C-alpha cells in the first residue's frame, strides 16, 4: 500500500477526482499482474515501430487499446477490413480484460489509502484474528439467538441494471472519465450477462476479472447496509472495523436529510420504532440474518422499511418474497452450510416441600446446528462423488493418479468437511458424508485396479477406515487434556474452530 501512495505522489494524482490519468501509467498494470503485460504486439495488429513493447507495459499500447474500445461500434460495421474483423472476433475480450484489470487497481487506491489513514489514527489496533473465523459467527449466534423470538432470512437484492453499480461508485469517486469508461465497458462488452443476475447467486462475479467485480459487489453491499449505519451505531460485538472507513456517508445522509425535511414527524416516529436493543444482524456474502426479541409486528415493519428504502431511495429492486419472517421455535434457517434452529425443550421437575409435592414445568431454548444432508448430497453429486440418491460412485478423472494421491485427496476433503462441520449438534449426517466419500474412494481405487470394492476393502483393512473417521478424534486428543469427561461424549458436542477463514468448496456449491 505504501507503493500506491508513492505512485500517487509521483504522478500528482493524490485526489480521487483524478483517477483516470492513472490508467495510462505503466506501473498500474505491473501491479495488476506483478509482471509485464505479456502482450504480443503481433496479435494486436500493431505496426512494427512498437513491437519493442512486447512483454512490457506501454503507455502507447494502453492508449490504443482504449481508443479501440471506444471505436468498437464503427469497427463492427467495417466488414471489409480483415484486420478489424479480427479485432472484433478474437481480441475483443482481451482488450476488455486488460483495461478492466488496470481499472480495478485504480479504483481501489482511494479506499485503500483511506483505510490506512483510519488505522493510523487509532493508537492501538485491536487484535481480532480469531474473529475472522467463520465459526466465530456461530459462537456469536449460539450466545445470542437462544434468547430471541423471531428471525428474518434475507437475500441481498440484486441490481437489475448495471447503471446502479456505476451510480454507487459515483457517490465515492467523482472522476467522470473513469465512470464513463466503466459504463462503456459494462454495456458494450458484457451486456449484463456476466454480472450479478437473478439467475445466479447474488454474489456471483464475472470470471474475466473477479477483482473488479468483487470490488463492485462489496460497494453495492455497503450501500445496502448503510441503513444500519444510520439507525444503529453498533449492533453486535462482532462489528466490522473497516466498514465505516469504506462507507461514504455524505450521499446517504443527504437522502435521509431530504426524507426528514418532507416527513420529519413521521420519520422520528419510525426511528423510535426501530430502537430495539435486542436486534442482531449477521451477513455472509449474499445472505443475511436479522433476529429480534420483539414482536412479529416489529419484524414486519423492518421488512417493509427495507423494501421501501431499497426501492424508493436507493433504486434497488427488492421483492418482498426475498425476506422471510419466522418464529425461532418453528423454523430452521440455512446459513453458511448449517441448518440452524432454536427449539423449545419442555421438561417437568417434581418438587416436594414437607408433605406437599408439585410439578414444575420448565422451558429451555438451545441453539442447535445440523448438517443439511439433502443439499450436501446434491453438492457431492455435482462433484461426481455420488448420484442424486446419495449412492457413492467412482471418480474416473482421478483414476490415473497413484493410490496414495487418490487416498490423500479423498482424505483431505473428508478432513476439511469434518473440520468445518465440527459445530454440528448431531453428527449422523456428517457420518453419512464420510461414508459416501470413503466408499467413493474405494470405488475409484477398485476401478483403477479393475477389482471389486469388497476385495479392495478387505485388502486395505482398518487403516483405510482410520484415514476417514479418526482424524478429528486425533486432533481433539492432542488439543484437550484428559478429563473424566470421555472423548467420545466430547466429540458429540459442537466444537467451533477459530482458524476457518473460508467455506469449503463443496459447502459453497449449495
Swiss-Prot record:
Q: Does the keyword rRNA-binding apply?
A: no
Give one GO molecular function term: RNA binding
InterPro entries recorded: Domain_X, Maturase_MatK, Maturase_MatK_N
Swiss-Prot/TrEMBL keywords: Chloroplast, mRNA processing, Plastid, RNA-binding, tRNA processing
Which GO BP terms apply? mRNA processing; RNA splicing; tRNA processing
Q: Where in the cell is it found?
A: Plastid, Chloroplast
Q: What's any one GO cellular component for it?
A: chloroplast
Q: What is its main location?
A: plastid
What task does this protein carry out? Usually encoded in the trnK tRNA gene intron. Probably assists in splicing its own and other chloroplast group II introns.
State the family named in the UniProt similarity comment for this chain.
Answer: Belongs to the intron maturase 2 family. MatK subfamily.
Q: What is the protein name for this chain?
A: Maturase K
Which source organism does the UniProt entry give?
Answer: Spirodela intermedia
Q: Which gene encodes it?
A: matK
Amino acid at each position: 500500500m505504501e507503493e500506491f501512495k508513492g505512485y500517487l505522489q509521483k504522478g500528482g494524482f493524490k485526489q480521487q477526482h483524478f483517477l483516470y490519468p492513472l490508467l495510462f501509467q505503466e506501473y498500474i498494470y505491473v501491479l495488476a499482474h506483478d509482471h509485464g503485460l505479456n502482450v504480443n504486439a503481433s496479435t494486436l495488429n500493431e505496426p512494427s515501430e512498437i513491437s519493442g513493447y512486447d512483454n512490457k507495459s506501454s503507455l502507447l499500447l494502453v492508449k490504443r487499446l482504449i481508443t479501440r474500445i471506444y471505436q468498437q461500434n464503427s469497427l463492427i460495421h467495417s466488414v471489409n477490413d480483415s484486420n478489424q474483423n479480427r479485432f472484433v472476433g478474437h481480441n475483443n475480450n482481451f482488450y476488455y480484460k486488460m483495461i478492466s484489470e488496470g481499472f480495478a487497481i485504480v479504483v481501489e487506491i482511494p479506499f485503500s489509502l483511506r483505510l490506512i489513514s483510519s488505522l493510523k489514527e487509532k493508537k492501538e489496533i485491536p487484535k481480532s484474528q480469531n474473529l475472522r473465523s467463520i465459526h466465530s459467527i456461530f459462537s456469536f449466534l449460539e450466545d445470542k439467538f437462544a434468547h430471541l423470538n423471531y428471525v428474518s432470512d434475507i437475500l441481498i437484492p440484486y441490481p437489475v441494471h448495471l447503471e446502479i453499480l456505476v451510480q454507487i461508485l459515483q457517490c465515492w469517486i467523482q472522476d467522470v472519465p473513469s465512470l464513463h469508461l466503466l459504463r462503456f465497458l459494462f454495456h458494450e462488452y458484457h451486456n449484463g450477462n456476466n454480472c450479478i443476475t437473478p439467475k445466479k447467486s447474488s454474489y456471483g462475479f464475472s470470471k474475466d476479472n473477479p477483482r473488479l467485480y468483487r470490488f463492485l459487489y462489496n460497494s453495492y453491499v455497503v450501500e445496502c447496509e448503510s441503513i444500519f449505519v444510520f439507525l444503529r451505531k453498533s449492533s453486535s460485538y462482532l462489528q466490522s472495523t473497516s466498514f465505516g472507513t469504506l462507507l461514504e456517508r455524505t450521499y446517504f445522509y443527504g437522502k435521509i436529510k431530504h426524507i426528514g425535511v418532507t416527513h420529519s414527524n413521521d420519520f422520528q416516529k419510525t426511528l423510535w420504532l426501530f430502537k430495539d436493543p435486542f436486534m442482531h444482524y449477521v451477513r455472509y456474502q449474499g445472505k443475511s440474518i436479522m433476529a429480534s426479541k420483539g414482536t412479529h409486528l416489529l419484524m414486519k415493519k423492518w421488512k417493509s422499511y427495507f423494501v421501501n428504502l431499497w426501492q424508493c431511495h436507493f433504486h434497488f429492486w427488492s421483492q418482498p418474497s426475498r425476506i422471510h419472517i419466522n418464529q425461532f421455535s418453528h423454523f430452521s434457517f440455512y446459513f453458511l452450510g448449517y441448518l440452524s434452529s432454536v427449539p423449545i425443550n419442555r421438561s417437568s421437575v417434581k418438587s416436594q416441600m414437607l408433605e406437599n409435592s408439585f410439578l414444575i414445568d420448565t422451558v429451555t431454548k438451545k441453539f442447535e446446528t445440523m448438517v443439511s444432508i439433502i443439499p450436501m448430497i446434491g453438492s457431492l453429486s455435482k462433484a461426481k462423488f455420488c448420484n442424486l440418491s446419495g449412492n457413492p460412485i467412482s471418480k474416473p478423472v482421478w483414476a490415473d493418479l497413484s493410490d496414495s494421491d487418490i487416498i490423500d485427496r479423498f482424505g483431505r476433503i473428508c478432513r476439511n468437511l469434518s473440520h468445518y462441520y465440527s459445530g454440528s449438534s448431531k453428527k449422523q449426517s456428517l457420518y453419512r458424508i464420510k461414508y459416501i466419500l470413503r466408499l467413493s474412494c474405494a470405488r475409484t481405487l477398485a476401478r483403477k485396479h479393475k477389482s471389486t470394492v469388497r476385495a479392495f476393502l478387505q485388502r486395505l483393512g482398518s487403516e483405510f477406515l482410520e484415514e476417514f473417521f479418526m482424524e478429528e478424534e486425533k486432533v481433539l486428543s492432542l488439543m484437550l487434556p484428559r478429563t473424566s469427561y470421555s472423548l467420545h461424549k466430547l466429540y458429540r458436542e459442537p466444537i467451533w474452530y477459530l482458524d476457518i477463514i473460508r467455506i469449503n468448496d463443496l459447502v459453497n456449491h449449495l
